[in-house]
């Protein structure tokens, strides 16, 4: 009984911990501001605009180091996925480009080369210019009926290659020996979440997810993975690895690599570092919104990708296929999918927190590739702006969680020995995936 009382007595101290923002700021932001004071021992990460000839890491624009390919994440897609990775070049042929008020600025049929930073839709008035930020790719077909082009392509079972769905690789020089490799994964459709069995909510045409591998002097140091506009960062050594044969061009070599594993959630394609159920967007002990991951088909994006470098303003293709496609399409900052359906549309539904069909996402150059910190942006409840790089894998929960993940309960297992049971239930209500447990997990990684 005494240990139980003591446990409840110290809960307020854990609650107070969440309001101390300087305990866990982004390590790279801290290093840049107070490098000498903190004694990190490594030079600061620079934004592309700060790089000089003396601090440059890559020898020239368009150069993609071999270590970037060798450490490309492998992606376990969900075993019952419906919307698999897709080819942006094929995807674009099923759309025209419209403004928010449904004025067509570029009609079908489209090719990838038709996308750009802006459009002059009328010959009569060549000075009339529509910035791409104000446009939407608008489907010619009824996407509610799952046309074939919306479904994407499964990876080859033996190799993990997807012949008809190249990943997009954008490498950014961050100076002083640092290099960021952004791997973008494109899907034609995002199937949203179910809330208490109802849904899906938050569906949208087009889906861009990505991961960031940050290198220092050719060695991977950190891995960040996107999820619902936010994401999670890890120390690279903490993430699960899988052995794979190294490829030199299209041929296998004799070298064996250890590649990081990430897990793509069913429908939403959010990325996680473990198998199971993952609550998202609602903090602490609420699990109204959850993603699900498992060890489904394995995708190796390094076997088919389009590679570029980016210096904060200019995109440079890495080889012939990318040069043939051009780079203008990457400067398209509009929505890669339809505008949110009008409430009068019979396909549209509403629940108190979300619509069934929402705006499509923006593309790769809208993902803050110039950032010096690891995180793309912060969730609405992360008011202190923390971006911790975890030192251990954040485990999934639920029936999909793997046995060695302690039933997916994470730090909630601390409560198992509390007696009497009513006191344990009270502690679980407050702590299990609640404020105290969340805070402990957040600050300890």
Language model segments and positions:
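Fungal secretory targeting signals
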Residues: 1-19
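A domain-level signal for the mature, folded cores of soluble proteins
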Residues: 18-205, 223-445
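Short, surface-exposed coil-to-beta transition loops
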Residues: 206-210
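Short beta-strand micro-motifs enriched in acidic
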Residues: 214-218
């Amino acid at each position: 009984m005494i240990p139980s009382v003591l446990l409840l007595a110290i809960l307020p101290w854990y609650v107070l911990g969440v309001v101390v923002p300087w305990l866990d700021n982004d390590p790279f932001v801290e290093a840049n501001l107070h490098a000498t004071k903190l004694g990190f021992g490594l030079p600061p990460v620079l934004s592309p605009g700060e790089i000089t000839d003396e601090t440059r890491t890559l020898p020239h624009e368009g150069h993609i180091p071999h270590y970037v390919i060798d450490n490309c994440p492998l992606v376990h897609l969900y075993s019952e996925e419906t919307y698999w990775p897709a080819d942006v070049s094929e995807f674009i042929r099923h759309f025209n480009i419209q403004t928010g008020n449904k004025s067509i600025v570029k009609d079908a049929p489209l090719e990838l080369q038709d996308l750009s930073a802006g459009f002059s839709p009328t010959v009569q008035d060549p000075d009339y210019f529509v910035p791409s930020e104000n446009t939407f790719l608008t489907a010619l077909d009824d996407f509610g009926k799952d046309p074939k082009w919306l479904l994407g392509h499964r990876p080859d079972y033996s190799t993990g290659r997807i012949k008809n769905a190249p990943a997009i690789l954008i490498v950014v020089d961050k100076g002083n020996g640092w290099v960021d490799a952004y791997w973008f994964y494109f899907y034609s459709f995002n199937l949203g979440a179910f809330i208490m069995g109802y849904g899906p909510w938050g569906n949208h045409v087009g889906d861009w997810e990505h991961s960031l591998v940050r290198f220092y002097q050719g060695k991977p140091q950190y891995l960040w993975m996107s999820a619902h506009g936010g994401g999670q960062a890890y120390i690279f050594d903490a993430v699960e690895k899988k052995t794979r044969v190294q490829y030199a061009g299209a041929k296998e070599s004799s070298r064996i690599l250890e590649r990081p594993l990430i897990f793509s959630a069913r429908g939403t394609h959010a990325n996680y570092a473990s198998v199971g159920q993952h609550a998202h967007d609602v903090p602490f002990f609420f699990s109204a919104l959850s993603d699900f991951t498992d060890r489904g088909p394995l995708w190796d994006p390094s076997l088919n990708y389009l590679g570029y470098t980016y210096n904060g303003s200019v995109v440079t293709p890495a080889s012939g296929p990318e040069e043939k496609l051009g780079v203008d399409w990457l400067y398209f900052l509009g929505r890669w999918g339809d505008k949110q359906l009008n409430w009068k549309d019979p396909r549209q539904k509403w629940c108190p927190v979300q619509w069934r069909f929402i705006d499509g996402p923006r593309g790769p150059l809208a993902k803050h590739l110039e950032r010096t910190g690891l995180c793309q942006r912060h969730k609405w409840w992360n008011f202190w702006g923390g971006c911790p790089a975890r030192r251990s894998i954040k485990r999934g929960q639920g029936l999909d969680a793997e046995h060695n993940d302690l039933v997916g309960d994470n730090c909630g297992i601390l409560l198992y020995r509390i007696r009497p049971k009513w006191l344990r239930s009270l502690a679980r209500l407050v702590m299990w995936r609640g404020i105290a447990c969340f805070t402990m997990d957040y600050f300890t990684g």
